[in-house]
Amino acid sequence: MAHGIPSQGKVTITVDEYSSNPTQAFTHYNINQSRFQPPHVHMVDPIPYDTPKPAGHTRFVCISDTHSRTDGIQMPYGDILLHTGDFTELGLPSEVKKFNDWLGNLPYEYKIVIAGNHELTFDKEFMADLVKQDYYRFPSVSKLKPEDFDNVQSLLTNSIYLQDSEVTVKGFRIYGAPWTPWFNGWGFNLPRGQSLLDKWNLIPEGIDILMTHGPPLGFRDWVPKELQRVGCVELLNTVQRRVRPKLHVFGGIHEGYGIMTDGYTTYINASTCTVSFQPTNPPIIFDLPNPQGS
């Protein structure tokens, strides 16, 4: 496939033959297509906070997976905050309110948020199934009354919440989606393959910034303890072959914190918490030139 230039024409993504085994998919495409190799694919150093913002640019501040541990985070200067989910432990209304209060004290012009697999109450189908179950895997969530969580996203009064939806701010089209491959039955989990692809097919072309909770295959998705890649193949194909955003921000995999590029799209795993849930990974800033006419 071509690297470094946008794709042309209508592209239809289908379920990849290696969809169910991302580690095998990575190996196959790396050997047969050099899909994850330099010079087009490489690591990117983060921008130091004291770097002046270039004229005619917007500065994005990227964070993720804060898990109700925001008190000690040093937030840098920027224009727009992007938080790609897991801002709570379980999505309890009290946790959401605390997060919203924290957002309210931040100076950014816009704060854009998506849910992650830990925001259980934001996933209506998950909550409906949980109520039917005769067990208490998440006792504090199971005890909630429907009126406590039916419109829990409305508690996020200090941000723009995206869920399979987009917003345009300062001329940038930004789309957010919370879905991740199934992992131990948390919120917004779907089976790999067609179920996830159906969600990615909702992403419109022409998006400048894509926010998902989890990574695409091959970009900041390595889990050393398991010696496995866990990114979504269909998400990778959607990003590289159809949508081609300038920036793809995600989290989910705490071990994958950092920045990469494929020569066209920049990929940021902004997980604030480490694998031991210590909020020590600093926010990542990224500058993009303002769209013409904005």
UniProtKB/Swiss-Prot annotation:
Q: Which UniProt keywords apply?
A: Cobalt, Hydrolase, Manganese, Metal-binding, Nucleotide-binding
Keyword Metal-binding recorded: yes
Q: Which residues bind GMP?
A: 117-118, 225-226, 252-255
Q: In which tissues is it expressed?
A: Expressed predominantly in fetal brain.
**Residues holding Mn(2+) 2:** 86, 117, 213
Instruction: Note whether Manganese occurs among the keywords.
Output: yes
**Disulfide-bond pairs as recorded:** none
- Show the GO MF annotations: AMP binding; GMP binding; manganese ion binding; phosphoric diester hydrolase activity
Please state how the activity of this protein is regulated: Inhibited by nmolar levels of AMP and GMP.
**Recorded E.C. number(s)?**
3.1.-.-
Cofactor(s) the protein needs: Mn(2+); Co(2+)
Q: Which Pfam families match?
A: Metallophos (PF00149)
Q: Which SUPFAM superfamilies match?
A: Metallo-dependent phosphatases (SSF56300)
Q: Where does Mn(2+) 1 bind?
A: 65, 67, 86, 254
PANTHER family xref list: METALLOPHOSPHOESTERASE, METALLOPHOSPHOESTERASE MPPED2
- State whether it acts alone or in a complex, and with which partners, per the record: Homodimer.
Family statement:
Belongs to the UPF0046 family.
Give the function comment from the record: Displays low metallophosphoesterase activity (in vitro). May play a role in the development of the nervous system.
Question: In its UniProt entry, what is this protein called?
Answer: Metallophosphoesterase MPPED2
What is the protein's species of origin? Homo sapiens (Human)
